[in-house]
Amino acid sequence: MIRTLEDSLRLVEGAGASNGGICFDTWHIVKLKIPYAELRRIPAQYITSVELNDGMFECPWSLHEDTVNHRRLCGEGEFDLKGFIVAMQAAGHRGPWGIEVLSEELRK
């Protein structure tokens, strides 16, 4: 499992594929406790897309349960989405942005 930005960058750089890159997802960045300041250092050519979602910092269920059933719509959780967006823009991202909310409640 890739747990650091450095590991992600090494993988992408090592692959040497012109169409390779990293999709940055707020949920993963927050759960891995990666400071937004670190995102500003990512070379823009490696940022392929960004996915926004919200959630809680701490939860009573398993990480897997949190991953697939308890993400929230933007603005309905505790994540600093504005800070994340500012950091990605500061890194030079000008590509696609999406919303990814895996939620048992929204699937009903």
Residue ranges and their predicted role:
Residues 2-24, 30-108:
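Histidine-acidic metal/acid-base catalytic patches
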